[in-house]
Amino acid sequence: MKVIVLGAGIIGVTSAYQLSRAGHEVTVIDRQPGPALETSFANAGEVSFGYCSPWAAPGIPMKALKWLFMQHAPLILRPRIDAAMLSWMAKMLSNCTSRRYAVNKSRMLRLADYSRTSLAALREETAITYDERMQGTLQLFRTEAQLDASAKDISALAADGIPYEVLDRDGCIRAEPALGRVRDKIVGGLLTPQDETGDCFKFANALAGRAEKLGVCFDYGTEIRALEVDGGRVHGVVTSKGRRAADAVVVALGSYSPLLVRRFGIRLPVYPVKGYSLTIPIADASRAPVSTVMDETYKIAITRLGDRIRVGGMAEISGYTNDLGIARRRTLEHSVMDLFPGGDAAKGSFWSGLRPMTPDGTPVIGPTRIAGLFLNTGHGTLGWTMSSGSARVIADLVSDRKLEIDATDLAIARYG
């Protein structure tokens, strides 16, 4: 089949690679001049199969109110008259129950664990290197209350068979020796040892190169204008360079996916939540992280990427704006320098990207009411983590092959 993948971020590139391996003639279309130049460009670098949780969780509404008044808040809300924003926020609040949290986290862990084995197979198959490390994620707690609140996550990990270790202060320091100098600032942590780290941009570019060798065509610098739909079936894509015919189309446009499909009555509850990152050179390796540390207080990930530290996080709900707020940079600098002052923050590269978030935290992967039109989007902060498994799921669905995991509850049909 002739398949068009819309979007050349990490989700689009991995999808194209797996579709090509499945025997399809694949074209990737993206407005940027190369792969992974938007949300996938400078994400936090964590490939967190175990540290995988919905933002919609019990207690979050009250925490959100408190965060709004914090100096270094993990959440920034800039309300506006925007029906999509208000609808998305209402749906997210409805998922902040213990029952919904358990269902959503189980879905996410299922896909993340599948992605773990899929990424391992892909790495072995392609021999791609991308500043990868396989030393786990340490969720770091500064207070006893944070440690106690991790019980629900521990229960979910145990139920899904995901390895974990609950660490005391000394255990955290053994995992991340640089924390020894700030031992009084931490009380414990939760280590998910199967988690990894790596540079998403490097990986996406290397895999795009492998995909081209398989015959995938990358049509960069091309605006996507509309889908061509007739008789309940997709027939192609209208672009700034003309029409492209297709037997199937995979929409992997991140936060922009809903804007493309809504004219066909597809109400895709994906909304942009801006995240920020700061990439700084390491000046003193003894005071730098070994792998990824999640600072639970500020909801910030601090990740070792070769000779760099990538600090990423925060959630700014402000629509489709990509401006850089200097206050957000100060928050990132505060978190990393407080725990790991081995980097030169003054030389840091500051960046922001729009994460495509669903209200329940689970991505939308699967068919739509339009024959031949598929979605692979809405991965939020976990696009890098879930990309390899999501790509195999979408390739199997497009190819009408038996899936290796249950993906029925990942489709848009779950929203009714």
Swiss-Prot record:
It holds the Pfam family DAO. PANTHER family: D-AMINO ACID DEHYDROGENASE (PTHR13847:SF280), SARCOSINE DEHYDROGENASE-RELATED (PTHR13847). GO terms for biological process: D-alanine catabolic process. The keyword Nuclease does not apply. It catalyses: a D-alpha-amino acid + A + H2O = a 2-oxocarboxylate + AH2 + NH4(+). GO terms for cellular component: cytoplasm; plasma membrane. Oxidative deamination of D-amino acids. Belongs to the DadA oxidoreductase family. This is D-amino acid dehydrogenase. The keyword Ribosomal protein does not apply. SUPFAM superfamilies: FAD-linked reductases, C-terminal domain, FAD/NAD(P)-binding domain. Pathway: Amino-acid degradation; D-alanine degradation; NH(3) and pyruvate from D-alanine: step 1/1. It comes from the Bacteria. One of its GO terms (molecular function) is D-amino-acid dehydrogenase activity. Its cofactor is FAD. FAD binds at residues 3-17.
